[in-house]
Amino acid sequence: GRCVCRKQLLCSYRERRIGDCKIRGVRFPFCCPR
């Protein structure tokens, strides 16, 4: 299980947000499995 950037506003209910990442200057949630 690797943490991934999600190109949407929210992480899934099975994930938790641990920070932000930038993709082309836009911030997205950085999500990890719980």
Curated annotation (Swiss-Prot):
Domain of life per record: Eukaryota
Subcellular localization(s) per the UniProt record: Secreted
Keywords: Antibiotic, Antimicrobial, Defensin, Disulfide bond, Secreted
The UniProt record lists the keyword Disulfide bond: yes
Disulfide bonds: 3-32, 5-21, 11-31
GO cellular component, as recorded: extracellular region
InterPro entries in the record: Alpha-defensin_C, Beta/alpha-defensin_C
Alphabetical GO biological process terms: defense response to bacterium
PROSITE patterns the UniProt entry points to: DEFENSIN
Record has Transferase as a keyword: no
Function: Microbicidal activity and inhibits corticotropin (ACTH) stimulated corticosterone production.
Family to which this protein belongs: Belongs to the alpha-defensin family.
Name listed for the protein in its UniProt record: Corticostatin-2
Native source species: Oryctolagus cuniculus
Organism taxonomic ancestry: Eukaryota, Metazoa, Chordata, Craniata, Vertebrata
